[in-house]
């Protein structure tokens, strides 16, 4: 089992190379039309399996379609990875949507709503006391 340094190094290399493949080699209009970013890579300890989390500026339905297209093209991407990097075995890859950004935005929205309600209540209290 590789150490954490090796996992981090291989993950970083995979992220860099897959990003280049998505930008330059993959001919998919949907992926090219929207900003697609690899936010995180989870690589198994034996370097055999890789989950790639992506974010995009697209709407939720389009993001799901982008993930489906990437999973359809994963053999092409994996094949290109094998040509670009020296590994005994290129890991099996699966693309997933990273929903952390959406969750963060909804938390910020809730906080803004609470702040506005609190400000409105303070304003009403001041009017009542005047």
Curated annotation (Swiss-Prot):
<dbReference type="InterPro" id="IPR020053">
    <property type="entry name" value="Ribosome-bd_factorA_CS"/>
</dbReference>
<dbReference type="InterPro" id="IPR023799">
    <property type="entry name" value="RbfA_dom_sf"/>
</dbReference>
<dbReference type="GO" id="GO:0005829">
    <property type="term" value="C:cytosol"/>
</dbReference>
<comment type="subunit">
    <text>Monomer. Binds 30S ribosomal subunits, but not 50S ribosomal subunits or 70S ribosomes.</text>
</comment>
<dbReference type="GO" id="GO:0030490">
    <property type="term" value="P:maturation of SSU-rRNA"/>
</dbReference>
<keyword id="KW-0963">Cytoplasm</keyword>
<keyword id="KW-0690">Ribosome biogenesis</keyword>
<dbReference type="InterPro" id="IPR015946">
    <property type="entry name" value="KH_dom-like_a/b"/>
</dbReference>
<dbReference type="GO" id="GO:0043024">
    <property type="term" value="F:ribosomal small subunit binding"/>
</dbReference>
<comment type="similarity">
    <text>Belongs to the RbfA family.</text>
</comment>
<dbReference type="InterPro" id="IPR000238">
    <property type="entry name" value="RbfA"/>
</dbReference>
<protein>
    <recommendedName>
        <fullName>Ribosome-binding factor A</fullName>
    </recommendedName>
</protein>
<dbReference type="Pfam" id="PF02033">
    <property type="entry name" value="RBFA"/>
</dbReference>
<comment type="function">
    <text>One of several proteins that assist in the late maturation steps of the functional core of the 30S ribosomal subunit. Associates with free 30S ribosomal subunits (but not with 30S subunits that are part of 70S ribosomes or polysomes). Required for efficient processing of 16S rRNA. May interact with the 5'-terminal helix region of 16S rRNA.</text>
</comment>
């Amino acid at each position: 089992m590789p150490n954490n340094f090796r996992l981090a190094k291989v993950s970083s290399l995979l992220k860099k190379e897959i990003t280049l493949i998505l930008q330059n080699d993959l001919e998919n209009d949907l992926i090219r039309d929207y900003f697609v970013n690899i936010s995180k890579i989870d690589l198994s300890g034996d370097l055999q399996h890789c989950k790639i989390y992506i974010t995009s500026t697209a709407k939720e339905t389009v993001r799901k379609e982008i993930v489906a297209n990437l999973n359809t093209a994963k053999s092409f991407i994996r094949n290109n990875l094998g040509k670009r990097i020296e590994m005994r075995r290129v890991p099996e890859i699966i693309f997933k949507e990273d929903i952390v950004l959406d969750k963060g935005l909804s938390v910020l929205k809730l906080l803004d709503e609470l702040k506005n309600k609190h400000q409105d209540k303070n304003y009403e209290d001041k009017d009542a006391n005047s």
